[in-house]
C-alpha cells in the first residue's frame, strides 16, 4: 500500500489494526509519529502484522528538518528487507530522492500536494498558491514544478481552457524537464500534459506505459491509463487498469469513482451499486456517492428505490452531481415542484472562472425543471443567466467544446433551434465520438436530445440507435422515462429503441 489517499483518514496509532488491514487489503501496516523541536525532528516507525498485531520491526530517527526526506529511503529499505521485498527502480528513486533542502519549500509542497489530491476547484486554487510558494522558495525544486504543471493541466482540462493556463502548464513542465528530466514525477507530469492539455491520448498512454514499467504499483498511473483507455474506446483494458488502481488505493474517492463510472458507462449497474454501497459503508455522508446511488436506481428505472435514497440527499451548496440527481428524479417522476423548491434554496451567485461553470450548470438544471413544469418565464430567466455566463467564458476559451455543448442545451431551452444546433454541431465537430468515446458520446447525446425536443425524429432516432450500441449514458430506460423525448413517442422507430432492457 503506497498511496497516501487510502491511509490519511487513519490516526497514527489506530485501535483496530486487523480491521484497517482488511479495509485496505494489506497484510502489514506501518505506523509512526513525528515530534518536532526547533529545526530538529524525532521520528518513530514500526511495522506491524495486521492480523496478529505482531511487531515485525521498529526504529527511531533523529534528523534536521532539511534532511527529513532521507529517512523515507531508509525506512522503505528496512521494510523491504523485513518483508523480503524488492523495490523497483522508479519506486526506489521516488522514496530516496532528496526533494529539497529548504524545509519551508518542503512544507509548502506537502500542503499543496495534499490539496491537489482532493481534485476540486476550491482546493486547487489554494494548492496552486502553496506550490508557487514552494518553487519561489526553491527554484530548483523539480518535483514541485512537476506537480504545478499537473495542476495547471488539470485546470485547463476543466473550467479554465485558456491560453494563459496552457502557457502556465507548459512553462512549469519545461522547468521541471530542464531540472530533472528523468525524475518519475516529471515523466508523470509529461503524460498528464498530453492527456489533459493536448488531448493526445496515444502520446499520453505511451508516456504512462513507459513509466508504469518502472513503477507498476502506482495507483495514480494505473487510474490515468484507465481513463485514457476509456476515451480510446478500449473498455476491457480500461477495466483492467481501473481495477488494479482501485485495489492499490481502495480508500481513494477518485479511484472508487472511476471504477463506478466505468460500470455506469458499460451499463453494469449491479456492480456499480455494490461499489457504491461499499463506499457508503466507509463514508455514509459522502453526497457524491449518495447521488451516484440515486442515479443507478434511476437508470435501472427503479424510481421508488431512488426516492428512498434521495430523501437523504441534502446538498448544502449547488454541487453538480447531487443537483443532477435531484433534477433527474423530478424529470423521470414528472413531479417538479419539490425539486424546484430544493434547488431554489441552493441558488449560487455568479462569479468567475469555475464559479461561472457551477452557476451555469445549476441554472440549466433549474431552467429545465421550470420549463417542464410549464413555467416558461422562470425557465427563460434561468437559461438567460446561464447563456450570459457561458458566452462570457467562451470569449477567453474559444476552443472549449464543453462550453458549446452547454450552450446548445441553453439555446434549446430558449427555443432557438438554429443556435442550439449550431453549438451542438460545433461541440461534436471538435470532439467526435471517434476521438473521445466518453466526451464525444456525451456531445452526440446532447445533439440527439435537442433534435428530439424539436420533434426531429429523422435525425434524433438514428443518432440514439447508434449511441445505444456503445457504452454510455443513453439507455432504453432513459428513453422511456425522460420527458425530453415525448415528441418521439408515437414513432415506431423510437418505440423499438425503448424495448430493450438494461443489464
Where are these regions (language model features)?
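Acidic, proline/glycine-rich low-complexity intrinsically disordered segments
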Residues: 1-370, 375-382, 387-399, 404-407, ...
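TPR/TPR-like (Sel1-like) alpha-helical repeat modules
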Residues: 169, 314-318, 383-384, 425-428, ...
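Extended glycan-interaction surfaces of carbohydrate-active proteins
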Residues: 339, 424-434
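Amphipathic alpha-helical protein-interaction segments enriched in hydrophobic
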Residues: 357-361, 400-409, 436-452, 477
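Extended hydrophobic-aromatic, low-complexity segments
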Residues: 377-379, 417-422, 436-440, 457-461, ...
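Hydrophobic, well-ordered secondary-structure elements that form the walls
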Residues: 408, 448, 460, 488, ...
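C-terminal structured "cap/appendage" subdomains that terminate the fold
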Residues: 449-480
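Terminal, low-structured helical/coil segments at or just beyond the last alpha-helical repeat
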Residues: 478-503
Amino acid at each position: 500500500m503506497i498511496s497516501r489517499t487510502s491511509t490519511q483518514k487513519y490516526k497514527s496509532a489506530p485501535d483496530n489494526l486487523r480491521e484497517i488491514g482488511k479495509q485496505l487489503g494489506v497484510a502489514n501496516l506501518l505506523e509512526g509519529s513525528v515530534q518536532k523541536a526547533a529545526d530538529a525532528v524525532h521520528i518513530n516507525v514500526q511495522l506491524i502484522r495486521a492480523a496478529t498485531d505482531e511487531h515485525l520491526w521498529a526504529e527511531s530517527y533523529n534528523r534536521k528538518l532539511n534532511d527529513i526526506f532521507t529517512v523515507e529511503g531508509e525506512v522503505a529499505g528496512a521494510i523491504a528487507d523485513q518483508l523480503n521485498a524488492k523495490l523497483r527502480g522508479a519506486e526506489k528513486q521516488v522514496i530516496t530522492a532528496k526533494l529539497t533542502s529548504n524545509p519551508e519549500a518542503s512544507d509548502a509542497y506537502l500542503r499543496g500536494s495534499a490539496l491537489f489530491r482532493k481534485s476540486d476547484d476550491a482546493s486547487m486554487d489554494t494548492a496552486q498558491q502553496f506550490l508557487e510558494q514552494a518553487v519561489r522558495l526553491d527554484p530548483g525544486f523539480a518535483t514541485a514544478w512537476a506537480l504545478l504543471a499537473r495542476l495547471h493541466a488539470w485546470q485547463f482540462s476543466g473550467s479554465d481552457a485558456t491560453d494563459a493556463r496552457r502557457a502556465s502548464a507548459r512553462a512549469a513542465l519545461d522547468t521541471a524537464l530542464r531540472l530533472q528530466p528523468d525524475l518519475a514525477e516529471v515523466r508523470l507530469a509529461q503524460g498528464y500534459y498530453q492527456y489533459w492539455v493536448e488531448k493526445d491520448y496515444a502520446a499520453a498512454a505511451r508516456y504512462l506505459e513507459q513509466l508504469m514499467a518502472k513503477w507498476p504499483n502506482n495507483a495514480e498511473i494505473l487510474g490515468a491509463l484507465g481513463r485514457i483507455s476509456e476515451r480510446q474506446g478500449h473498455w476491457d483494458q480500461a477495466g483492467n487498469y481501473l481495477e488494479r488502481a482501485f485495489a492499490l488505493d481502495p480508500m481513494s474517492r477518485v479511484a472508487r469513482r472511476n471504477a463506478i463510472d466505468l460500470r455506469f458507462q458499460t451499463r453494469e449497474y449491479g456492480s456499480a451499486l455494490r461499489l457504491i454501497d461499499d463506499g457508503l459503508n466507509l463514508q455514509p455522508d459522502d453526497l457524491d456517492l449518495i447521488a451516484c446511488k440515486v442515479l443507478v436506481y434511476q437508470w435501472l428505472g427503479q424510481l421508488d428505490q431512488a426516492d428512498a435514497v434521495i430523501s437523504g440527499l441534502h446538498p448544502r451548496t449547488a454541487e453538480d452531481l447531487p443537483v443532477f440527481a435531484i433534477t433527474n428524479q423530478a424529470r423521470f417522476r414528472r413531479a417538479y415542484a419539490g425539486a424546484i423548491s430544493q434547488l431554489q434554496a441552493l441558488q449560487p451567485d455568479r462569479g468567475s472562472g469555475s464559479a461561472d461553470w457551477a452557476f451555469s450548470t445549476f441554472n440549466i438544471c433549474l431552467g429545465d425543471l421550470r420549463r417542464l413544469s410549464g413555467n416558461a418565464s422562470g425557465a427563460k430567466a434561468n437559461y438567460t443567466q446561464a447563456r450570459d455566463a457561458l458566452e462570457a467564458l467562451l470569449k477567453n476559451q474559444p476552443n472549449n467544446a464543453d462550453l458549446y455543448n452547454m450552450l446548445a442545451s441553453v439555446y434549446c431551452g430558449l427555443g432557438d433551434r438554429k443556435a442550439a444546433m449550431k453549438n451542438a454541431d460545433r461541440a461534436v465537430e471538435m470532439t467526435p465520438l471517434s476521438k473521445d468515446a466518453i466526451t464525444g458520446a456525451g456531445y452526440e447525446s446532447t445533439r440527439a436530445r435537442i433534435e428530439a425536443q424539436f420533434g426531429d425524429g429523422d435525425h434524433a432516432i438514428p443518432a440514439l440507435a447508434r449511441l445505444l450500441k456503445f457504452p454510455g449514458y443513453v439507455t432504453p430506460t432513459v428513453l422511456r422515462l425522460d420527458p425530453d423525448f415525448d415528441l418521439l413517442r408515437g414513432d415506431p422507430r423510437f418505440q423499438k429503441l425503448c424495448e430493450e432492457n438494461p443489464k
